Amino acid sequence: MATPHINAEMGDFADVVLMPGDPLRANSIAETFLEDAREVNNVRGMLGFTGTYKGRRKISVMGHGMGIPSCSIYTKELITDFGVKKIIRVGSCGAVREDVKLREVVIGHGACTDSKVNRLRFKDHDFPAIADFGMVRNAVDAKALGVEARRSNIFSADLFYTPDPSMFDVMEKYGILGVEMEAAGIYGVAAEFGAKALTICTVSDHIRTHEQTIAAERQTTFNDMIKIALESVLLRDKE
């Protein structure tokens, strides 16, 4: 049944949901990649759709908003109230290393964070916020499409405008390729409620070089990561 934030019914969502931050990007993904897509949520403008990919697989796509608090609400409700088993975040990140280029795809197998949300979940202990191994493996295998992607830890920040830029030097030292705002929270929610999750990001801006993409491009393109996400679902179904 409907929740305070999702006006759908059980069965409206597929067991796999792709989740961009921007609900308009969710609409673009549904229009571009899914057949017979229908709207299943519009509460607060957080659009959600369910359709079929390549005539073979029912898949849903829905926005999750910005930051861990927002994405945690939506992912929790999808899992506990609508039977969703797998979440794939498809979003943007900022690069912190010179060798990472604009529009590259980064598969986040783990997520460091300055947020305290997972400590609240885990009785004030550190929780290893990691993606499901099988989902990571299939995303890597989906690179056979000819799409280049890199795999690394990423960093989920609570603040978009950080007051301490020296933290980027620490991230670079530890091999982190990108900064975003949600993955650690999504991995925590998935672990708490027995689901699986993965984050795939496209580099939308570069913290070192100050290069950036424009909002319209982020909304309607970045299709390589979407292809990896969708094809990884088909690979999973073959197991």
Curated annotation (Swiss-Prot):
Q: Which residues bind phosphate?
A: 21, 25, 44, 89-92
Binding-site residues, a purine D-ribonucleoside:
5, 180-182, 204-205
Entry-linked Pfam families: PNP_UDP_1
**Which residues of this protein are catalytic?**
205 (proton donor)
The EC code for this enzyme is 2.4.2.1
Q: Which SUPFAM superfamilies match?
A: Purine and uridine phosphorylases
Q: Which UniProt keywords apply?
A: Glycosyltransferase, Transferase
- Pinpoint the site Important for catalytic activity: 218
- Where does this protein have coiled-coil stretches? none
Keyword Cell membrane among UniProt keywords: no
A Gene Ontology cellular-component term:
cytosol
> Which reaction equation describes what this protein catalyses?
a purine D-ribonucleoside + phosphate = a purine nucleobase + alpha-D-ribose 1-phosphate; a purine 2'-deoxy-D-ribonucleoside + phosphate = a purine nucleobase + 2-deoxy-alpha-D-ribose 1-phosphate
Kindly state a single biological-process term from the GO annotations of this entry: purine nucleoside catabolic process
CDD domains on file? PNP_EcPNPI-like
The keyword Iron belongs to this UniProt entry's keyword annotation: no
Any one GO MF term held by the record is:
purine-nucleoside phosphorylase activity
Q: Belongs to which family?
A: Belongs to the PNP/UDP phosphorylase family.
Fill in the subunit field for this protein: Homohexamer; trimer of homodimers.
Any idea what job this protein has?
Catalyzes the reversible phosphorolytic breakdown of the N-glycosidic bond in the beta-(deoxy)ribonucleoside molecules, with the formation of the corresponding free purine bases and pentose-1-phosphate.
Database matches in NCBIfam families: deoD, PRK05819.1, PRK13374.1
Quote the PANTHER family the UniProt record gives.
PURINE NUCLEOSIDE PHOSPHORYLASE DEOD-TYPE, URIDINE PHOSPHORYLASE
Q: What is this protein called?
A: Purine nucleoside phosphorylase DeoD-type
Organism per entry: Klebsiella pneumoniae
